[in-house]
A protein has these predicted regions:
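Conserved catalytic/dimer-interface elements of ABC ATPase nucleotide-binding domains
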Residues: 2, 20, 28
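Protein kinase catalytic-loop region centered on the HRD/HxD motif
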Residues: 1-9
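Catalytic-loop of the protein kinase fold
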Residues: 9-16, 21
Length: 152
């Protein structure tokens, strides 16, 4: 995703079904069908009234039709990390609209409450990745990758 983001591309539908791992453990991101080019000065990538993406993994700003950039993909990856370390999605009650509302509210249980065996700091890393305010998330995939290195 770092390379895509460096080219100004935001995936907007990052989810487990779009992450493939080959026999050499190399990750491949697929289905850029709703991806959009992001350039400095763009105010938004989606027309008002249109919701594009998978509700379980959508960033709050994407749900609200606000300006979307690479931090929306960081949010989606944070949701996937949450599922990996807890075994459950952060938000799953109700229909798609209810799940999207829960993402906007941002009141997921802390991963360490669900899985007390997490290494110190990993729960905070996941929560930071899923911050409702995108300025409080990791600001790039590279920054998130560097933070994850401690947990190899």
């Amino acid at each position: 995703m770092t390379v895509a983001h460096q080219q100004g591309i935001v995936h907007r539908d990052l989810k487990p079904a779009n992450v493939l791992i080959n026999q050499e453990s190399l990750l491949k991101i697929v289905d850029f069908g709703v991806a959009a080019a992001h350039r400095e000065g763009d105010t938004q990538l989606t027309k008002t009234g249109y919701v594009i993406g998978s509700p379980k993994y959508m960033a709050p700003e994407q749900i609200l039709g606000k300006k979307v950039d690479e931090r929306a993909d960081i949010y989606a990856l944070g949701v996937m990390l949450y599922e990996m370390v807890t075994g459950v999605p952060p938000y799953s009650r109700g229909d798609h609209m209810s799940v999207m509302y829960q993402h906007v509210q941002g009141k997921a249980r802390v991963p360490q409450e669900i899985n007390p065996n997490l290494p110190p700091g990993l729960s905070d890393l996941v929560i930071k990745s899923m911050a409702v305010d995108k300025t409080k998330r990791f600001q790039s995939m590279e920054e998130l990758r560097a933070a994850l290195e401690r947990y190899k």
